[in-house]
Amino acid sequence: MNALSQYLSLFEANRTAFESVTSPAVNELRLEAFRMLSEATLSGKDATSLETMIAPDRGINVNRIAMPVEIAASFKCAVPHMSTLLGLIIGDSFHATTSLDRQLPDGVTFMSLARASREHPELLTQFGKIAPADKAEVALNNMMWQDGALIHIARGTKVDRPLQLVKIFSGANMPMMAFRRLLIVVEEDASLQLLSCDHTQDRGEYFSDEIVEISLADNARLELCDIEESSLTTSRYSSVWTRLGHDAQINHTTVTLSCGATRNNINVDIVNPGARSRLAGMAIVDKNMRIDNRTSVNHLSEHGTSDQLFKYVLDDEARGKFEGCITVAPGAKFTEAYQTNRNILASKNARMNSNPWLEIYNDDVKCSHGASTGQLDPDALFYMEQRGIPQAEAKVMLMQAFMVDIIDAVGIDGLRDRLRHLVETRFSGADDRSCDACQSHCRQ
């Protein structure tokens, strides 16, 4: 049976429940997605393909039953030297912290996306306009999502405290899944710093499907850091679609500290002159973890700049993949676009596949791409051992140094030091992998 069939049947049988939580305009997109998926097929059989991830029969909270989770337990880890405005998604349901609404400055909306669709449709003009609805992964989310988060920054608003969105699975006594939707809109001359964290609080079998649409208007700025620390029994399929206005800038860092099977699709459209995109990512995986990062940066206007740097360290039986494409359209003169992937295999059984490429349809550009995969430098290890540093400690130091440029590029003050600590803890093999970069108190 087609992996999509169970979702089409589920939607058809529960259409009233799906449509009860969102606005008529959103529900029109649901029906369009249902019609498209009825004739669609999915491709790909590898561990991080959408078809593989959605094939298992898992529960979904269609009727919006309250999940058995102790929300208070999510706020025990404060972020040193960092004050955030915190929202929480449990499963797929948005929960504002007690003080969030009164702490939000003027011009900032941070709330349930489903509720916003009913109460503030004027803030959802970009919803469904950025992620292409004719792609199966987008259509499936269009049909199935019931909640998520809206972040809207009004024109000229400079948010002086980072927003933090913690997404948690916890407490289910059966395999569970959630379809999440995020809409981030930063209007003209506005700026935002956002820390987004994915966690599972136990070893239940979980799957999250997430679509993120980001709209940056002219001269808007977004600093975004995604951190995942999930269990081996968690699967995650995330797609981010960003559209940049004139002179808009995004700095997006993706950090995978642990996972089961994760696929991150990161797409940027530079549709106006002067826009800048920086994508960075690090993955630290071991055991039989699977991590797959795929990027697509489309230069559709002149004087655009993009830079990509992704680094992986893989140990044990872990598998990694990086696939990145830069496309420069005929009219995108004076484009500068760079892409680099560097990887370390820390065991003989780890595997990495890298496939960066360029599609350039304009001569007046500066573009490059490259990839390398290897082991730790034996000469550097020998040098450190000769100076009395134990081999295990030397390896940790070299792997930390390998990730320095990713961490240093994070534009959220207070987070860089926490990431350095998390990376050191991860490489040292410490049992406690709680994500101190979040205010969630996640124990695996």
Question: What spans do the regions from the language model cover?
Answer:
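N-terminal amphipathic, basic helical "cap/leader" segment at the start of enzyme domains
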Residues: 1-139, 309, 315
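Conserved beta-strand/loop scaffold segments within soluble protein domains that form the structured core
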Residues: 106-109, 116-389, 403, 407-438, ...
